[in-house]
Amino acid sequence: MFIGIKSCEKYNDNYAVEVEYIDLFSTRIYPDGKGGQLGDRGHINNIKILEVKEDKVIIADELKKGEYEYSLDTERRNDIAVQHTAEHLFSGIALKDYNLNNVGFRMGEEVSTIDLDSDTISDEMVKELSGKVNEAIRCV
């Protein structure tokens, strides 16, 4: 896949690039924080993508204006998609079976958390809810 670099500016200890997609079929680089999800990582011209914002991509080294090959970490992207889907499944079962609303979700690199609107969730309830979610996943 190829991407156009429209500009490159120093950004803290790294560089911020404004990108332009060359064709309609190029995979878009997904930004951090959109919909509560983690953003894409990968490489542009073998330079590591460190962070993705709505209007710029933060990379580890400087690039001149032009067209470059890029790749995304598909394993990371798939993991993010699975976590996002699991959050919806967990939230749906929590609401349906326990009348608990999801009031917050934070997806992390190592750990993700869901906040439910109750101060009295027991360890047994968490175990039971997790079991129902895992059973629903196995049925799919």
Residue ranges: model-predicted function:
Residues 1-140:
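A glycine- and charged-residue-rich anion-binding loop/surface
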